[in-house]
Regions:
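Nucleotide-sugar-dependent glycosyltransferase catalytic core
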Residues: 76-92, 182-184
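Alpha-helical membrane-protein architecture signal
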Residues: 80, 84, 114-121, 188
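Loop-to-transmembrane boundary segments
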Residues: 110-130
Length: 228
């Protein structure tokens, strides 16, 4: 979880900012000016309020900036049970906003020739890193039957190259964390983590966890910054 957080914030959003593209509001790390609230009010009341309000601001012509130097502190989930409720809420909220707002972002992006709005639609639509890895593995297994086929044989090698690229990016994330050794040890949980995370995404896509916000208790007494 720490690795994907570093990749999302320290690499993806920071990279978007460096080339002039916009970020998204990210829960604990949101910072809004009073003039924004006076002009737009607060219109997001779903379980994915950060995604929802991000889209409302973008469609309203506002800019969302990512500050790579900012740090937020929060108590992270301590086990799979706590994390399941939290991740299901996040996934369900994102899919709800995706279903109702992606087309509006793309349409306005085309009408206004705004690459940034179209990129924001892609950000909302794209699977998370763990889902990308799971789907790439499924592609590799499924394309195994095509090895040696003169026409479809390339699909296996394409899937293998995709997995290698995702794995390399993940390794970059490991060595970008504050405790690379601990992150490396966590690799033993990957065979459990990927199916668990993909299940969360599928349930979120079906609408589970969308009715109640419901923050879960944290057993740890210390706070750790999970977003940078």
């Amino acid at each position: 979880m720490a690795v994907t957080g570093v990749l999302r914030n320290g690499r993806y959003y920071a990279g978007k900012t460096a080339i002039g593209l916009q970020g998204m509001l990210t829960g604990t790390g949101m910072c809004l000016g009073t003039e924004i609230l006076e002009r737009h009010g607060w219109t997001a009341f779903s379980v994915g309020e950060d995604w929802e309000f991000s889209v409302e601001l973008l469609l309203g012509g506002q800019k969302i900036y990512f500050n790579p130097l900012a740090k937020t502190f929060a108590k992270e989930s301590q086990n799979f049970k706590q994390a399941s409720h939290q991740r299901l809420r996040w996934a369900s909220g994102r899919y709800a906003v995706m279903g109702s707002k992606v087309s509006a972002l793309i349409r306005q992006g085309i009408l206004t020739s705004s690459i940034s709005l179209i990129d924001s639609a892609v950000t909302l639509f794209a699977p998370n890193y763990s889902s990308q890895a799971s789907l790439a593995l499924l592609c590799l297994v499924g394309s195994w039957v095509n090895v040696g086929d003169p026409f479809w044989g390339f699909t296996f090698y394409w899937a293998a190259a995709l997995i290698a690229a995702i794995a390399s990016y993940f390794v970059l994330g490991i060595f970008s964390t504050e405790a690379p050794g601990k992150a490396l040890v966590g690799l033993v949980l990957v065979p459990v983590f990927l199916p668990w995370r993909l299940t969360i995404e599928l349930l979120g896509m079906l609408g589970y966890g969308r009715r109640h916000w419901g923050r879960r208790s944290r057993s740890a007494t210390s706070s750790k910054h999970v977003n940078r």
